A protein has these predicted regions:
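Long, low-complexity, Lys/Arg-enriched
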Residues: 1-320
Length: 320
């Protein structure tokens, strides 16, 4: 959401804002104590079709210390992860919950120091993200309020949500605001999005990506101060990213200039805001020419370049 932050700071900054670092992997780690099933869904279930051995999965997740424990549940590190043994891997997570929590202790400490410094004395924090299930927001809400015991109201502004009951509950109580679509507003757009989600979500992610490296997780430096562990350099064209960001900034500049000239605030309705994006999403050939060599891996964790999924591969597989 780097470009959204740039637009806000340049043209709309009425409330103090900072570009807070977060990642799906880190948020999953930080909420592991409460959400082990969520950890399993993102880290293990999504790797079932990846032709990895159990040992390779645990190594990729930096949980090598659990490899000797596979024998306890009748598994071997050289077995391929599959739908049949995945439930036993979930058992492994629950059985060694405390050991895993201990391995994340430094990360929790670093994240707590980082977020306390960023949030400071603020009493209401709104995390801005794309979507789609609000899981990163929910994980950070748990971490900040339950683990860090911070007295802060937390909400999230998303582009769209995908109609899950727990997301609807957070919309009902005002914790999540979904601008373009949800099960409660513009549900027809949500249904179209959900049908095309595997490809469309990746296009959204590319449009709103940045040229800086992505955060993997937090750590402490030698002085005990919060630091960051970054993902390896992802495959993507920095010139295309710069051009997309400049186009977004140019539009925001022209739009706010018109508002000032007319002396009115021109609020863009959700459907109108979505219309050009909706058209772009349907231009598969155009998107393929632009983004075919963009890495779009949707598996959390430090995935090797050899296993990285490219946009062209997703399109060729029909988004599966």
């Amino acid at each position: 959401m780097d470009v959204v932050y740039k637009v806000y700071q340049r043209f709309f900054a009425q409330v103090d804002a900072v570009y807070v670092k977060a990642s799906r992997t880190s948020s999953i780690h930080l909420s592991f104590e409460r959400h082990i099933d969520h950890f399993f869904d993102w880290h293990i279930r999504r790797r079932i079709s990846s032709a990895l051995t159990l040992g390779e999965v645990l190594h990729e997740l930096e949980l090598d210390f659990l490899i000797p424990d596979l024998q306890e549940i009748g598994l071997h590190e050289d077995e391929l992860l599959c739908a049949d043994n995945a439930p036993q891997m979930k058992e492994l997570l629950y059985a060694h919950r405390e050991k895993i929590l201990d391995s994340y202790a430094q990360e929790r400490c670093a994240a707590q120091k980082y977020y306390r410094a960023q949030i400071a004395e603020a009493k209401h924090v709104c995390f801005v993200d794309l979507g789609w299930k609000g899981s990163t927001f929910s994980s950070l809400e748990y971490f900040l309020k339950e683990t860090c015991q911070m007295d802060v109201q937390i909400s999230s502004a998303l582009l769209g949500t995908e109609g899950h009951a727990f997301v609807d509950e957070k919309i009902d109580c005002g914790k999540i605001d979904s601008y373009i679509f949800s099960s409660q507003a513009n549900a027809d757009i949500m249904r179209i999005h959900n049908r095309n989600g595997n490809i469309w979500r990746r296009i959204y992610e590319i449009i709103f990506t940045a040229n800086e490296r992505s955060l993997l997780r937090f750590c402490l430096d030698e002085q005990g101060e919060p630091d960051f562990v970054w993902l390896r350099d992802e495959v993507r064209d920095p010139h295309i990213i710069d051009a997309m960001q400049q186009g977004i900034l140019d539009f925001a500049h022209d739009y706010t200039q018109i508002e000032r000239r007319l002396g009115v605030d021109l609020v863009i309705a959700a459907r109108d805001a979505y219309r050009p994006l909706f058209r772009i999403l349907h231009e598969t050939d155009y998107n393929l020419r632009l983004f075919q060599e963009f890495e779009v891996c949707f598996i959390a964790g430090n995935v090797s370049r050899q296993r990285a999924e490219m946009f062209k591969d997703v399109v060729m597989k029909g988004g599966k």
